[in-house]
């Protein structure tokens, strides 16, 4: 079962407690968001260590080195900011029709939530800006084609970042316009540049595919729930035999989804005057009626499995590199 996301009006983003319902409430139904104080402190510590690593010249991927095949190239501290900004600009290579606003809003939320984990070494202002854009309705225009998938939704996330730099395009109040104009109309100050590590921090994640998947999962769960309602109407119209939903039958089978659907069918058909008053001239129905719990239940079990994996990914940090803080010395370990 799933609760109604429209009942969720406000969500505190902390990096670890996002649910499918709260995700949909923000991405699709425009629930407001705020940054958890604990996440703010974690990001401040992480950023301080990233700056320390850069100042010491330690070898750390994406902080003091280039990217990909250029990982062995040392990057001088004075060039690290430009390198981060260039990473965004160079990866804006997606093509095709733009994603729906709800998918892009989901991407923004997931990127902010991942950065709230406090292991990416970025400034809190990036998360604060993403959340402000969500609250004020500035949605970057992000083309659908061109992601690397599990290696990172690099191109979609680069396009998502452009309006934060006063570039690209965005939707605001239902109108597509230059990103700088949308941000100005919403009263959001843009950034002149990113700083070291932030190019990777904004792009190295699975936020696009997870946003698409989470919204599809929510719609699939809703469809499964409606499937039981439709099945009950068919069952009633064909004057089926309700003993097929006897809980004892499904308890000895032990399948969670099957038991759930059988209970739902009993509830939906309880008090049916048609079934109470019809003549029974058979001992069992056709498979299509008596096996509704087995069929629908298998779908419910599959959706439960997918939900478990999606909700892990909603709160996952998929950045590279990661800065792990060892308390109380606050020594940084890079992975």
Describe the residue ranges of each PLM region.
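N- or domain-start disorder-to-order transition segments that initiate the globular core
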Residues: 4-57
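Terminal amphipathic helices with adjacent charged low-complexity linkers/tails
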Residues: 79, 236-301
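Glycine-rich loop at the start of a catalytic domain that most often binds anionic cofactors/ligands
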Residues: 69-84
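Acidic, low-complexity proline/glycine-rich segments
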Residues: 10-20, 184-203, 264, 268-279, ...
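Short, hydrophobic/aliphatic alpha-helical segments
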Residues: 39-59, 129-144, 187-193, 321-322, ...
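Single conserved hydrophobic/aromatic residue that forms the stacking wall/gate
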Residues: 323-335
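Active-site cavity-forming subdomains of large catalytic enzyme subunits
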Residues: 92, 96-100, 104-255
């Amino acid at each position: 079962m799933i609760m109604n996301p429209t009942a969720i009006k406000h969500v505190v983003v902390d990096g670890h407690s996002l649910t499918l319902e709260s995700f949909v409430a923000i991405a699709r139904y425009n629930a407001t968001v705020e940054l958890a104080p604990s996440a703010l402190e974690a990001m401040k510590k992480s950023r301080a260590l990233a700056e320390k690593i850069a100042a010491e010249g330690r070898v750390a991927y994406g902080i003091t080195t280039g990217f990909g095949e250029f990982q062995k190239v040392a990057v001088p501290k004075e060039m690290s900011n430009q390198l981060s900004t260039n990473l965004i600009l160079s990866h804006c290579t997606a093509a095709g029709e733009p994603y729906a606003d709800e998918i892009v809003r989901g991407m923004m939320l997931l990127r902010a939530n991942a950065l709230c984990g406090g292991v990416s070494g970025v400034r809190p202002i990036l998360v604060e800006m993403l959340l402000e854009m969500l609250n004020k309705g500035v949605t970057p225009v992000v083309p659908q084609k061109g992601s690397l998938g599990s290696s990172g939704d690099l191109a979609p996330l680069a396009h998502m970042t452009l309006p934060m730099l006063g570039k690209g395009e965005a939707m605001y109040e239902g109108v597509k316009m230059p990103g700088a104009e949308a941000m100005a109309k919403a009263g959001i100050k843009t950034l002149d540049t990113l700083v070291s590590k932030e190019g990777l921090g904004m792009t190295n994640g699975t936020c696009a595919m997870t946003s698409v998947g989470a919204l599809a999962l929510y719609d699939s769960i809703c469809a499964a729930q409606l499937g039981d309602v439709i099945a009950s109407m068919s069952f009633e119209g064909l004057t089926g035999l309700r003993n097929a939903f006897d809980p004892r039958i499904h308890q000895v089978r032990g399948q969670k989804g099957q038991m759930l659907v059988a209970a739902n069918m009993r509830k939906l058909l309880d008090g049916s005057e048609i079934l109470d008053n019809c003549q029974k001239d058979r001992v069992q129905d056709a498979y299509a009626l008596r096996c509704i719990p087995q069929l629908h239940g298998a779908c419910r079990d599959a959706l439960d499995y997918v939900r478990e994996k999606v909700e892990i990914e909603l709160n996952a940090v998929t950045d590279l590199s990661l800065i792990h803080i060892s308390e109380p010395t606050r020594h940084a370990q890079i992975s």
